Amino acid sequence: NEDELFDSISKSFTLKLKIVVDNIESSFEINLREFANLYDVNLEKSKISFAFNKSTIIFSELEIETNEEIRIIETMTPKMVLALKSYGFDSLFVNFTNFIKLNRYYLHYIGISKSQDSFSRLVVKPHDKRLRILSNENTFDKNTRLTDEIMLLFFKIEPFRIQIVNNTIDNSLNYTRLISDAEKAFISILNSDYNKIKYKDYPKTNDGLYNDNFTGYSYKLGNLLTLVTSDTTITGDMFSEYNLMCENADTIMIQGDSVELISNNSGEK
């Protein structure tokens, strides 16, 4: 509604928007002052203009007196909105409804990069699983291409807290083994379709953390998103200085020879 749009801008300097996917409707507001801060727009000398193009918003910076375009600030799509919100830009996107329900991804494949960066491994060079997914899968929306729907999600493994009870245990943590262990943990629990090796014996591994003598440890997704496979669903929570333990995230718990997914039902799934 155009009247509501300009009313929200004039009163609260926010841009009210809506994303609809299938039967899920999500409304939110873009805080334009935060947007200006994020993209270094001096609101005393410039103003923000925006234009809609299908499902895209084009933000521009204009000179106040002449109204001349200085630059295109950002071309924002629903994917970008979800990604930024997922990575913690809470002050930029406010009053977001049904976010967890909307920010769901069907997970096809899990992999790690040991000798090169993930972008080079997946995009720059031909990657067997990525090519198979593009060849075999169908789109959810008949009006889009599969390349428009595929998302590459990159995660950094961050060890948060290690409590040493027995001083005879070496408290150093090998990062390569940690990454390898995390990959196997998620594959064994989520059973993603294009991972041929399922690691059914996990946590027993030769290159993971099994032999590091930990009493127990766990993995959580530190982002506000949900990963879905044919077998199960796992939901994350935003990691921040105010939410160090990702309280609302599901947990992959490893103790001894056992591994299980502990679901947190406090949030929307």
Where are these regions (language model features)?
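Boundary/linker segments flanking structured domains
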Residues: 1-269
